[in-house]
A protein has these predicted regions:
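Subtilisin-like peptidase catalytic core
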Residues: 63-70, 112, 159, 163, ...
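Helix-turn-helix repeat elements of alpha-solenoid scaffolds
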Residues: 71-87
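Residue at a conserved register position within TPR or TPR-like alpha-solenoid repeats
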Residues: 104, 111-114
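N-terminal domain-start motif of subtilase-like serine proteases
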Residues: 149-164, 248-282, 287-296, 362-372, ...
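Hydrolase catalytic cores
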Residues: 177-209, 397, 543-607
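Subtilisin-like serine protease catalytic core
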Residues: 265-415, 430, 512-514, 524-526, ...
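Substrate-binding/access-modulating region of protease and related hydrolase catalytic domains
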Residues: 366, 400-506, 554-559, 563-565
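Extracellular S/T/G-rich loop segment that most often corresponds to the catalytic His/Ser-adjacent loop
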Residues: 486, 492, 500-577, 581
Length: 617
């Protein structure tokens, strides 16, 4: 199963393919119902994404050809999509805010493309009402509103730049700083060639495989790309300059940096402390064990088809020669997200700006490969930071990085299930105390993979097959974790700002006594805009711009719940090292007891948890 690797370069590039993130939401959020919809009591209650309908749309031409097709052809697709979305809202009482944000955000994109500017304020208001994080609530719909006013008032780019500066300057900087900087980075990477190349080399391939009957979401992607190319790209410089003016003014005023409440909570174990070695498992995409003290067994690995492999660190293959450049691009992406004008950031912008459509697939796949190559080592560095007694064991999954997914089959899922059992057994054999899992997936991932390969007679059949395959792996993973009560497993919740419960993520959605699921905050202790939530998300830790190791030893900052969960694994490993007699239940209890609750956030406090055990730091 593929992993949602936390590689900001990839996410920044992908943002340019989303349904106009610059216009719709930048982040999107319960609306009452579609106009004319049935009363709530008469609508079907939806508590899981599995309950929602799946649809396909028959295209008359390749998706890429719609990028330059007559507007009337795209409007016909948009009308069909809008009718289906409004029918769903009339029929279903959807209990998940993130899913509702998707619906309303799509309607907003459609309204903008159709030029229905009068509908924009109401849709923006509905999105804001669905957003429970202060930063996204403040920024949601800002650009959609500006563009609507620009279009109706026939304003020029200079007006847009000034409005961007004024409206973002009026926001609470503590709430919106990270989002504004990230949004500026997304805008700087806008490139129509990137969109065209992604369509031609990836989306068109899927459409051909599916004999032109594509998932309905592809229509939204087409409309979003047209809207982006026609309305957003011409305003790129104005928006970037306006946002930069806001950032510059905040830095000049001295309030550009948030207060750091995270670092003072941390503690380090001295090399001469009275402590015992503790085995820490990193179940991930591979670890450069040369950077760490490994356990005796070192690790176990499985390839893209879940067959045993000897590669504990993912090979770069033909991309090895490009590693220095890829490393620069990864660093540049992080600098761009932080709105830093560095040489690495400039190189990334130059690389994206000069991309030709035929180069996009290789470029994106190499970045994806680099992400998987670096992810596990970065996670491991966080998990053992400040703990000289930690010994690392890697469980390496060589997930697919190419755009063409592995074809899901029952045989593959049963091999995956068996691999999960073997991996956990290896943890037991190595007597590990803590295992970090910075990955998750749900049944919907298999639906997309099955669709790519045109497996299943229709979307509903694909949905059922996906759930059957997913259930094989879900049950095996749950049983494997439950079979090791002496090991504390720690999982990242996800980076989709959605409900792990609604999406049925594993392992994040498991409720087991030896598992902790972790969401992400920044150094100020504020929930990040991307962090997934849910009933099983019981702890939070810093997952924003966390510095750690890359293979080879360089250090870089990554963001994601992938960076938050190893912070909890780090604390657990330190407690086990200092008091090896502790049980999983005791460590779990003291971590939870030491955490500080503020609304939905339950932020760990490593020092407090240690002190609750009587440890003198």
């Amino acid at each position: 199963m593929t992993m949602n690797a936390i590689v900001v370069a990839t996410s920044l590039l992908s943002a340019s393919l989303a349904a106009t993130p610059a216009l719709a939401a930048q982040t999107s959020p319960l609306i009452n119902t579609a106009a004319g919809g049935a009363p709530t009591s008469q609508r079907q209650v939806i508590t899981s994404s599995e309950q929602l309908p799946r649809r396909v749309v028959k295209l008359d031409k390749l998706p890429s050809q719609y990028l330059e097709a007559p507007r009337a052809e795209v409007l016909a697709l948009a009308d069909t999509l809008e009718k289906n979305l409004r029918d769903d809202l009339a029929r279903f009482d959807i209990q998940d805010a993130a899913t509702m944000r998707g619906y309303i955000g799509s309607l907003l994109t459609l309204a903008q493309y159709k030029g229905d500017w009068a509908a924009v304020p109401g849709l923006v208001a509905q999105l804001k009402a669905l957003q429970d994080k202060p930063g996204p609530r403040a920024t949601t719909g800002t650009m959609a509103t500006i563009v609507a006013e620009q279009q109706t008032g026939k304003r020029d780019a200079a007006w847009v730049q000034d409005e961007v500066r004024k409206r973002y300057s009026a926001m609470n900087w503590t709430d919106v700083a990270d989002g504004v900087k990230s949004f500026k980075g997304q805008m700087e990477l806008l490139n129509p060639a990137l969109v065209k190349g992604s369509f031609e080399q990836q989306i068109d391939v899927m459409a051909r495989n599916m004999q032109m009957s594509v998932p309905e979401a592809i229509v939204g992607t087409i409309v979003g790309a047209r809207l982006q190319n026609e309305l957003v790209v011409p305003l790129k410089a104005a928006v970037v300059n306006g946002l930069q003016a806001v950032i510059d003014a905040r830095e000049k005023a001295g309030n550009a940096t948030k207060r750091d409440i995270w670092t003072p909570r941390l503690f380090t174990i001295a090399p001469n402390a009275r402590a015992s070695e503790v085995g820490v498992g990193i179940w991930d995409s591979g670890v450069d064990l040369a950077l760490f003290k490994p356990t005796a067994g070192r690790g176990i690995a499985f390839d893209r088809e879940v067959r045993p492999s000897k590669d504990l660190l993912r090979p770069l293959g033909d991309s090895q020669a490009n590693w220095p450049q890829l490393k620069t691009l990864l660093k540049g992406a992080m600098d761009l997200q932080a709105a830093l004008d560095t040489e690495d950031a400039r190189r990334l912008k130059q690389a994206v700006a000069t991309l030709k459509p035929e180069q996009v697939k290789q470029f994106q796949e190499e970045l994806g490969l680099a992400g998987l190559y670096t992810h596990g080592t970065h996670v491991a560095g966080i998990a053992v930071e400040g703990n000289p007694f930690a010994r690392v064991y890697t469980a390496t999954m060589l997930w697919e990085h190419r755009s063409e997914p592995v074809k899901p089959t029952e045989e593959l899922s049963r091999r995956t299930a068996e691999a999960y059992k073997q991996i956990v057994q290896s943890f037991k054999d190595q007597k590990l105390r803590v295992v970090n899992m910075s990955w998750r997936y749900g049944a919907s991932a298999y639906e997309g993979m099955l669709a790519w390969h045109n497996v299943g007679a229709n979307p509903e059949e694909r949905k059922q097959l996906a759930r059957q395959l997913f259930a094989i792996e879900r049950d095996a993973l749950r049983q494997a974790i439950a079979s090791a009560p002496e090991i504390l497993f720690v999982a990242g919740s996800g980076n989709e700002d959605n409900s792990a419960d609604f999406e049925e993520y594993i392992p994040a959605g498991f409720n087991l006594p030896n598992l902790l699921t972790v969401g992400a905050v920044d150094k100020a202790g504020e929930e990040t805009s991307f962090s997934t939530f849910g009933k099983t998300v019981v702890l939070h830790a810093n997952g924003f711009e966390v510095e750690s190791l890359l293979p080879g030893g360089d250090r870089v900052k990554f963001s994601g719940t992938s960076m938050a969960s190893p912070q909890v694994a780090n604390l657990a490993a330190k407690l086990f090292a200092l008091k090896p007699e502790l049980t999983v239940a005791q460590v779990r209890e003291v971590i939870l007891k030491g955490a500080e609750r503020q609304g939905r956030v339950n932020l760990i406090h490593p020092r407090k948890s240690a002190e609750l055990l009587g440890l003198r730091l």
